[in-house]
């Protein structure tokens, strides 16, 4: 099967095999790895160095003759004293050859055709040369790089030397695995100096095609072999020089090398086009989803909401086909819930204004009993502060009027022990749950000194640390398995007056964009922590308790549906990834 047919016949697999990145990027497509196109690039590269990308021509001068000419030029360099004479090199054994070569090709090694890590001597210390740190070396297939200008005297020691025409690969992890490699060109005065984390090769002859050698250094087989040979500790592993200079290289006739480079460049350009089309399509799809979902939250009444939802539901199967689109749907459901648009209001429900009266009565009683201090009146809420209009029976209030916030205690680190009472820190709070992987304790007998900081089942705690990332605020509901534990500083506990708000509805509000934007509008400014005063001042849409229950029931039902849909999408995506892998393996083997 030709490469063109392989691409065209399986276009859907190459373009639909997507992988979600762990780190966020710009737009929805910035969080997506185009796995299928990545595998297609790797396949084209591997076919190139195995002699399967272009047909062989029996009229080409065989690689054996090319290697003889290179050996002759190498001998001349030795004769001129430009390089040292090498010891006789052992033949490449059959066991070392990873695959079978086409007719006219030969196995060779870098040490047979290039000088490894050559030195450069410059007589003028003031001479300007190119300086190339690792970040300026590209992972692209063209071997491109950038450089800074420095004087020779400033960089002649402690760095790697190279010149125009030299080829280099990164030897340290993860730069090696990411295929950072370069063909040096355009260097100031033809000379360069750079990071010590490079292996450099200077071909003995100008007839050697540098671009073809670069393809070898970027091929999946070379990278996989190099990774297996790395030495050193985790995070500091390096590909040894021995591997670089002795790993077998599949070497084609010179004319075929040139045809391979031309064809490879054409196919990479095609991959670039596919990649751009895929990214544009993904972004357009997500923008469409978010625009249509926006009509739901912007709906002025129940009738308009029903009309807008009908428009979306007609195209549900084509709209919600990615994990990002389902996440957007979940966030919209959450927004509708806190805006009072998810379930109809019941005029028979006790209005929120009555709940506020009960809260005021309970607070007055607690003050009378000396259990809490009398609170200064919180400022009235202006119309400008209100992010949206509330339904009948709801009331805007400040969180500080319905919750008392307790900040954690600043336990001293010298009190910490390996066993005892657990301390709940920021590190132990994830998004909705606790995480006890990294735990600190204080002695059990100290509990009586800190009774106010003892947490109970169903307490809600919130991290006061910035940054608040796009996935939402860090909060947790304390469960029985978390106990006993004490509250550490920079974590706050919500204490609800008169049990007027269910924990479930509060957590829905904490996840909403309205709350996140009110507590951290610039997505994390220079202030490292959120204060409990800020929490007290933020707004909360207080609603009838019966409606809270109806909303939570509906939310559970809809989120469960979203989770099922996301699972189906993930499963289908995994199948596409396996299919891309299988196609690649089948084409190579």
Swiss-Prot record:
The keyword Transport does not apply. Keywords: DNA-binding, Restriction system. Gene3D superfamilies: DNA methylase specificity domains. The keyword Endoplasmic reticulum does not apply. GO terms for molecular function: DNA binding. It comes from the Bacteria. SUPFAM superfamilies: DNA methylase specificity domain (SSF116734). Pfam families: Methylase_S (PF01420). One of its GO terms (biological process) is DNA restriction-modification system. Contains two DNA recognition domains, each specifying recognition of one of the two defined components of the target sequence. Belongs to the type-I restriction system S methylase family. Type I restriction and modification enzymes are complex, multifunctional systems which require ATP, S-adenosyl methionine and Mg(2+) as cofactors and, in addition to their endonucleolytic and methylase activities, are potent DNA-dependent ATPases. The type I restriction/modification system is composed of three polypeptides R, M and S. The restriction enzyme has stoichiometry R(2)M(2)S(1) while the methyltransferase is M(2)S(1). This is Type I restriction enzyme EcoAI specificity subunit. It comes from Escherichia coli.
């Amino acid at each position: 099967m030709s490469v063109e047919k392989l691409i065209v016949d399986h276009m859907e697999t190459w373009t639909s095999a997507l992988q979600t990145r762990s780190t966020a990027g710009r737009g929805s497509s910035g969080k997506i790895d185009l796995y299928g196109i990545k595998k297609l690039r790797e396949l084209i590269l591997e076919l190139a160095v195995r002699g399967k990308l272009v047909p062989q021509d029996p009229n080409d001068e065989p690689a054996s003759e090319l290697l003889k000419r290179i050996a002759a030029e190498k001998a001349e360099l030795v004769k001129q004293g430009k390089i040292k004479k090498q010891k006789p090199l052992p033949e490449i054994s059959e066991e070392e050859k990873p695959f079978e070569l086409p007719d006219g090709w030969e196995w060779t090694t870098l040490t047979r055709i290039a000088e490894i890590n050559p030195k450069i001597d410059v007589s003028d210390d003031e001479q300007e040369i190119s300086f190339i740190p690792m970040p300026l070396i590209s992972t692209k297939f063209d071997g491109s790089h950038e450089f800074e200008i420095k004087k020779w005297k400033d960089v002649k020691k402690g760095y790697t030397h190279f010149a125009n025409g030299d080829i280099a690969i990164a030897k340290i992890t993860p730069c090696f695995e990411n295929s950072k490699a370069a063909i040096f060109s355009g260097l100031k005065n033809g000379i360069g100096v750079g990071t010590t984390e490079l292996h450099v090769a200077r071909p003995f002859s100008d007839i050697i095609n540098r671009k073809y050698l670069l393809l070898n250094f970027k091929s999946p087989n070379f990278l996989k072999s190099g990774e297996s040979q790395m030495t050193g500790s985790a995070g500091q592993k390096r590909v040894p020089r021995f591997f670089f200079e002795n790993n077998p290289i599949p070497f084609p006739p010179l004319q075929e090398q040139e045809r391979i480079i031309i064809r490879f460049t054409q196919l990479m350009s095609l991959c670039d086009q596919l990649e751009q089309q895929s990214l544009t399509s993904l972004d357009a799809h997500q923008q469409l989803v978010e625009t249509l979902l926006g009509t739901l939250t912007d709906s002025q009444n129940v009738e308009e909401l029903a009309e807008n939802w009908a428009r979306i539901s007609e195209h549900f199967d084509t709209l919600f086909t990615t994990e990002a689109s389902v996440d957007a749907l979940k966030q919209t459901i959450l927004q509708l819930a806190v805006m009072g648009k998810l379930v109809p209001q019941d005029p028979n429900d006790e209005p929120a204004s009555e709940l506020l009266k009960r809260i005021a009565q309970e607070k007055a009683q607690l003050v009378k009993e000396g259990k809490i201090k009398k609170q200064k009146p919180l400022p009235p809420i202006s119309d400008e502060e209100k992010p949206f209009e509330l339904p009948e029976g709801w009331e805007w209030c400040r969180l500080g009027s319905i919750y008392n916030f307790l900040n954690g205690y600043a336990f001293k680190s010298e009190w910490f022990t390996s066993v005892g009472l657990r301390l709940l820190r920021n590190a132990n709070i994830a998004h909705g749950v606790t995480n006890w992987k990294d735990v600190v304790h204080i002695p059990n007998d100290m509990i009586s000194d800190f009774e106010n900081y003892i947490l109970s089942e169903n307490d809600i705690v919130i991290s006061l640390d910035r940054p608040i990332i796009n996935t939402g605020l860090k909060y947790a509901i304390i469960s029985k398995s978390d106990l006993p534990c004490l509250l550490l500083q920079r974590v706050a506990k919500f204490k609800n007056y008169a049990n007027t708000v269910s924990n479930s509805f509060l957590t829905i509000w904490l996840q909403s964009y309205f709350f996140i934007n009110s507590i951290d509008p610039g997505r994390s400014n220079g202030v490292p922590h959120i204060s409990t005063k800020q929490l007290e001042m933020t707004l909360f849409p207080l609603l009838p308790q019966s409606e809270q229950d109806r909303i939570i029931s509906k939310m559970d039902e809809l989120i469960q549906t979203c989770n099922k849909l996301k699972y189906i999408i993930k499963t289908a995506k995994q199948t596409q990834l396996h299919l891309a892998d299988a196609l690649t393996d089948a084409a190579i083997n």
